[in-house]
Amino acid sequence: MAIDLLSTFIKPMHREGTKFVAIFAVVTLVLFLIWEPLGWIGVGLTVWCYYFFRDPVRVTPTREGLIVSPADGVVSLIEPAVPPAELGMGPAPMTRVSVFMNVFDCHVNRAPIGGTVTAVAYRPGKFLNASLDKASEDNERNALAIRLADGRQIAVVQIAGLVARRILCEVREGTPLLTGERFGMIRFGSRLDVYLPEGVQPLVCLGQVMTSGETVLADLASPEARRTGAAR
């Protein structure tokens, strides 16, 4: 029972966090030598750093055609928008679903659906609050185009935020991805935009809490109209 309880709190850590946790741990040892109360503050910060870089296992639905959330967080925007020009996906608007991650969310990013990466495009930019509408256009971003088995395309865009200053993308053009597979992360608060294929409606609502790799964001085969919801 004790082991089960520990597993609830202790999660695997993304390798990107190893150096940061090591630095925090060394600084903590120095703080203990200077003054013990400072050392305990360092312990708390080290634990927080480990928690930030956690990379928990997720149970991804495997039915063909399901699009899952690429990030933990809250749905902040659902609107028509043209995908980033650097992806070469054309000028036609697509339904964009934005998931905002705060500093307490897990920041590992996952593929919303299986397919082949056809383009990866990084663009430098500003570091505005990622929850703002204009962050999609003005902020630093890294965009991916994924071609599905039926030939349709979906776009996923990692957007840096006010605190987030480091976008990590571990895939390149030609990389095959499975639904829910890890492809990168953004450090310290940010946003993920998903551009859905034409005619596909989101099955999530504004303000809904999302779990990356698990929450179904849309269904390619569903005729259901866009959902609405209310906070209760």
Swiss-Prot record:
Its transmembrane ranges are none
Chain positions found as Pyruvic acid (Ser) = 190
Q: Keyword annotations for this protein?
A: Cell membrane, Decarboxylase, Lipid biosynthesis, Lipid metabolism, Lyase, Membrane, Phospholipid biosynthesis, Phospholipid metabolism, Pyruvate, Zymogen
Q: A cellular component term (GO) from this record?
A: plasma membrane
Co-factor remark: Binds 1 pyruvoyl group covalently per subunit.
Topology within the bilayer: Peripheral membrane protein
Q: What does the record give as the active site? A: 190
Location comes to: Cell membrane
Q: Name one GO molecular function term.
A: phosphatidylserine decarboxylase activity
A Pfam family of this chain: PS_Dcarbxylase
Q: Which cofactor does it need?
A: pyruvate
- Gene Ontology BP term (one): phosphatidylethanolamine biosynthetic process
Enzyme Commission identifier(s): 4.1.1.65
- Give the main EC class: lyase
**Mod. after translation:** Is synthesized initially as an inactive proenzyme. Formation of the active enzyme involves a self-maturation process in which the active site pyruvoyl group is generated from an internal serine residue via an autocatalytic post-translational modification. Two non-identical subunits are generated from the proenzyme in this reaction, and the pyruvate is formed at the N-terminus of the alpha chain, which is derived from the carboxyl end of the proenzyme.
Question: Coiled-coil segments, which residues?
Answer: none
Listed pathway(s):
Phospholipid metabolism; phosphatidylethanolamine biosynthesis; phosphatidylethanolamine from CDP-diacylglycerol: step 2/2
| Major place of residence | membrane
Under catalytic activity, the entry for this protein gives: a 1,2-diacyl-sn-glycero-3-phospho-L-serine + H(+) = a 1,2-diacyl-sn-glycero-3-phosphoethanolamine + CO2
Subunit details for this protein? Answer: Heterodimer of a large membrane-associated beta subunit and a small pyruvoyl-containing alpha subunit.
Task: Family membership, please give it.
Answer: Belongs to the phosphatidylserine decarboxylase family. PSD-A subfamily.
**Function, as annotated:** Catalyzes the formation of phosphatidylethanolamine (PtdEtn) from phosphatidylserine (PtdSer).
| Protein name as annotated | Phosphatidylserine decarboxylase proenzyme
Q: Which organism is it from?
A: Cereibacter sphaeroides (strain ATCC 17023 / DSM 158 / JCM 6121 / CCUG 31486 / LMG 2827 / NBRC 12203 / NCIMB 8253 / ATH 2.4.1.)
Q: Which gene encodes it?
A: psd
